[in-house]
């Protein structure tokens, strides 16, 4: 048993702050959370005055198999699976080094995300818990076709979905619209699947108790994804051939459905402003702010691994994305919520992580300072626990101690 004490404990639930709090941990699980002394005695006590303990952060949209460079299709396609798996492991290590204890990998080839997920759980590699989607379902020659999930009609969609689930997928990913990085594929403002075919994906996922993440930039794709019953809409940019065109009526439809939206907000946006001008960034910030005002349940996810506008979006840049939410008008407490407990629910793991409470995994971070007052304090990591294992701790060799 071990106890971690801090000046503040943020449980992840809105408004729940424990001053001079402590967490009692037994192995991989949280036993209790409360004020100092509530956990009784323990063999190990870590006292962190001047620090805040909060749930481990969650990145709801990553691509561990990409290298954060331009044109991952050309660059990574010739790479062997053996080499790519090592690249994914390094990206996972960088991600957890930023305080991310759970991520959702929304697109990988050859079921490599499953291999890495299981290796991390076994203690053979260092990284966050991975919610793995495996091969995205897409039309022939569609967005991310090269990952192996091409399917054009209902029988083919069911086959790919069932193969992914048989392999061990934690969720399914479907490309409801085109995208930005697949040469020759439909553009982002074009719909790839209508409501009925998207509903097939949802049915197959539900048959195994899983959810669906739908990549959707186009207005029609966003609407169809929500009508089909997906768990999360990814990007949700309201894209048209002339750029972002926010649709308030469609946003209200999304909000009323209760569907989560991961707008893939990342810190690269600031460098895009410097290199491409303010118009695109300001339009996107306005869209993110408008979705909040509409009552849409947004969650944190960075699309890490995919270069944006020619600028690398690394897996260790997570906090920069949260700071963009702040620029869009979100308060710090709300940002912590959408990066922890709300993101966990969106990813389908809210029963086991995302908040600090008895019975959940001991996934937590400790930072010097108070992120409720200064969001940048999330960069001041003193401790990262993944299922109770220290993968980052100031003054401690976690490179060897975290791998059994």
Identify the role of each PLM range.
Residues 51-124, 141, 196:
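Metal-associated gating/positioning segment near the N- to mid-region
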Residues 68-71, 182-185, 222-230, 247, ...:
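Histidine/acidic-residue-rich catalytic or RNA/ligand-binding cores of hydrolases
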């Amino acid at each position: 048993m071990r106890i971690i004490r801090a000046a503040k404990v943020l449980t992840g639930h809105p408004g729940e702050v424990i001053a001079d709090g402590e967490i009692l941990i037994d192995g991989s699980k949280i036993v209790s959370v409360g004020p100092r002394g509530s956990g009784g005695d323990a063999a190990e006590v870590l006292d962190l005055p001047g620090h805040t303990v909060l749930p481990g952060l969650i990145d709801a949209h990553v691509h561990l198999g990409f290298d954060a460079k331009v044109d991952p299709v050309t660059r990574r396609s010739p790479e062997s699976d053996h080499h790519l798996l090592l690249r994914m492991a390094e990206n996972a290590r960088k991600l957890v080094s930023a305080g991310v204890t759970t991520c959702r990998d929304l697109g990988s080839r050859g079921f490599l995300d499953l291999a890495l997920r299981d290796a991390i759980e076994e203690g053979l590699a260092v990284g966050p818990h991975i919610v793995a989607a495996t091969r995205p379902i897409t039309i022939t020659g569609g967005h991310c076709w090269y990952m192996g999930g091409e399917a054009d009609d209902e029988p083919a969609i069911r086959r790919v979905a069932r193969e992914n689930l048989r392999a061990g997928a934690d969720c399914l990913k479907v490309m409801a619209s085109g995208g930005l990085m697949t040469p020759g594929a439909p553009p982002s403002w074009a719909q790839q699947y209508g409501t009925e075919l998207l509903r097939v994906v949802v049915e197959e996922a539900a048959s195994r108790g899983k959810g669906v993440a739908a990549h959707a930039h186009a207005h029609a794709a966003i609407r169809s994804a929500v009508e089909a019953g997906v768990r999360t809409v990814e990007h949700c940019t309201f894209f048209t051939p002339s750029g972002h065109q926010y649709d308030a009526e469609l946003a209200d439809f999304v909000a009323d459905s209760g569907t989560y939206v991961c707008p893939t907000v990342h810190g690269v946006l600031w460098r895009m402003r410097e290199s491409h001008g303010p118009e695109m960034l300001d339009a996107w910030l306005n869209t993110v702010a408008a979705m909040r005002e509409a009552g849409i349940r947004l969650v944190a996810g960075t699309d890490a691994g995919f270069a944006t506008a020619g600028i690398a979006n690394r897996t260790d840049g997570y906090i920069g994305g949260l700071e963009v939410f702040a620029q869009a008008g979100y308060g710090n407490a709300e940002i912590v919520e959408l990066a922890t407990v709300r993101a966990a629910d969106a990813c389908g793991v809210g029963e086991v992580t995302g908040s600090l409470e008895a019975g959940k995994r001991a996934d937590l971070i400790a930072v010097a300072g108070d992120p409720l007052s200064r969001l940048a304090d999330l960069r001041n990591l003193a401790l990262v626990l993944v299922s109770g294992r220290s993968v980052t701790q100031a003054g401690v060799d976690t490179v060897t101690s975290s791998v059994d």
